[in-house]
């Protein structure tokens, strides 16, 4: 959408949350060479056999990087943090995707958009995502979320 601002590029390394609990370097990961976190991320790859299930899904790079940063003190709250020289930006900077409605919500902070096609997921899951997106677009975000909560028996936030 726009060039990465100089104040972001000035960090040794930077990336962003895809949601409050997970840092996704697939959105963006900029770094200087030999930044102190990189060996730990690479080591995380060497120790894993990808394809394993984690929380009902296939483990991926998000799990590796979030784990390394968590060991460095990352708080999974979606707020800006500096962990071992890595600036982690809130979701609206590099991932303005709303997973609940399958739509985009840009802000004045938004630098880029990652299109989640979820091509690695089973066909049934991809169809589910498309149905959610269509329902949210048809009903409107607020009505869709209210209906979803009512069906699940959740209280309104």
Show the residue positions of the predicted features:
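Glycosyltransferase-associated regions of secretory-pathway enzymes
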Residues: 2-157
């Amino acid at each position: 959408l726009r060039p990465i601002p100089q104040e972001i590029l000035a960090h040794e390394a930077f990336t962003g949350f895809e949601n409050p609990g997970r840092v996704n370097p697939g959105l963006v990961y900029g770094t200087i060479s030999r930044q102190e976190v990189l060996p730990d991320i690479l080591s995380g790859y060497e120790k894993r056999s990808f394809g394993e299930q984690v929380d009902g899904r296939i483990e991926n790079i998000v799990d590796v990087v979030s784990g390394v940063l968590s060991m460095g003190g990352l708080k999974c709250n979606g707020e800006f943090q500096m962990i071992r020289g890595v600036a982690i930006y809130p979701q609206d900077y590099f991932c303005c995707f709303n997973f609940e409605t399958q739509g985009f919500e840009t802000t004045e902070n938004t630098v880029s958009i990652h299109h989640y096609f979820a091509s690695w997921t089973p066909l049934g899951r991809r169809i589910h995502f498309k149905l959610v997106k269509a329902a949210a677009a048809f009903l409107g975000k607020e009505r869709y979320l209210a209906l979803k909560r009512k069906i699940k028996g959740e209280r309104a936030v």
